[in-house]
Amino acid sequence: MFISSSSLAMIVETGRNGSEPVARIQYGQLYLIGSPQKDIVTEYAQERTHQQPENPFASLIPDQTIAIIPSFTLESGETLHNVPLAYSTRGRLSPNRDNAMVICHALTGSADVSDWWGPLLGGPGRAFDISRFFVICMNSLGSPYGSASPVTCKDGNPENGRYGPEFPLTTIRDDVKYGMYPC
């Protein structure tokens, strides 16, 4: 189930390069195509938490993980390298992988679901019941709280300086593809 805080829209399918889908939702179940045994972050993504010295905002979000995507091509055709993707999870993914709930944050939000939807997150009786669901929230492109944004270093290299106003324009499609990349 994919929930957007602005539209509560369901996203049915997306692909890494706009061609083959990496995940789909069918009859309420999340299917990771091609690799049902892989975890949310796979072998090609390095994991690090709170280790972005160039980005002081990344450490403001407790309990998030930052995966590094080696290469990511935007809808515009521009390719970013060593792209950080911050995300947080609550609950446990079931062996059948049929209990995933992906929540997208608002434009100015972060991957910390409990910060902005706290009253809905918890145990039985809550909308986001983490005793039943595996809740994951990925930080959107352009948000400074750990994901690729104007405050991150170009290509992940501090010697290149920060993107600043040169950070490329992104689309909702880019965010969907970016959020599904580690699957």
Enumerate the language-model features and the residues they cover.
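Catalytic-loop region of hydrolases
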Residues: F2-I3, S7-A100
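Short, solvent-exposed coil/turn linker segments
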Residues: A23, I68-I69, S110, D129, ...
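Generic structural hydrophobic/aromatic packing signal, biased to beta-strands
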Residues: A67-I69, C104, I136-M138, D175, ...
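Catalytic micro-motifs at enzyme active sites that drive phosphoryl/nucleotidyl and oxygen chemistry
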Residues: L74-G77, G122-R126, Y181-P182
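Conserved phosphate-coordination/catalytic loops
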Residues: H81, T170-R173
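N-terminal cap/lid subdomain of alpha/beta-hydrolase-fold enzymes
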Residues: S88-G156
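Conserved acidic catalytic loop of the alpha/beta-hydrolase fold
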Residues: P158-R162, E166, R173-C183
